Amino acid sequence: MGCAIVNGHTILLLVVDRDYRGQGIGEGLLRECEETIRKNGFEKVVLGVGFDYLMPGVPTSRQWAPSVHEHLDPMVNTAASDFFEHRGYVHAWGACNCFDMRMQLEDFCQNDHRIGDMIDGILYRWAVDSDLNEICLCADDACQYQDESFSKYYCNASLYHGDSHQRVLVAEKQGRIVGTLIVSIETEGKDTGNVGCTCVATAEAHQGIATRMVMLGTRYLRDIGLKHANLSYTYSNLNKMYGASGYEISTYYFMGEKVIKLCET
């Protein structure tokens, strides 16, 4: 009928079968989750992203800031986010949206360049093993003002094998790596590709490098015969960059948090 998964202070999943909703089952599961988190010594409950995650937050059609490039999945609505908001949870990202994007690759029409081309003095190519140190430096530099660095996502050795389902695209300027992107092939289902973990060195930001990497990676996915492309867990303003390739927002996320009182001892 329903289930929930807790890890540390995070509710990774809370779901009730459609036929059993409106009977208090979800509320009971939430109460048990909060009590478990409280007993484990935490003062805050997080929905979605925490020590680990299945999805960034609670899927919703609601947005917290004006947005563009939007084409929501018709199955997405505000029911789940309303459930948590009515029980004291707030969107922790303020006036910033979190969302997934997707596109049909038959609609991709940016055909001017492909991976391997030199564009405006920058070479866009597949990474090799010997690039790893520079890739990590680039990712750390790009994320220096964020809570999390993306360099850890680039450390898997299989990313640098030509036959892997995930590969790293880099932007190289005068022998130095200034941009990185992970391109994934059918890791999220048949006929579906993914681009993400986009990083550009701070000194090279706002020059179109990220937009170009996304276009080239997306063209590659189309050219090898995939039908769909997704990108997950991104946020306000980046939809413009991804939208230049044709991606549209498919679902928003309620990044819910709630402060709870510790158990008295």
What are these regions (language model features)?
Residues 11-22, 49-53, 197-206:
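A short, internal acetyl-CoA/4′-phosphopantetheine-binding micro-motif in the GNAT/acyltransferase core
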Residues 51-55, 187, 237:
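Feature marks short, surface-exposed loop/turn motifs that line or immediately flank catalytic pockets
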Residues 10, 112-149:
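Short amphipathic alpha-helix that is part of the acyltransferase structural core
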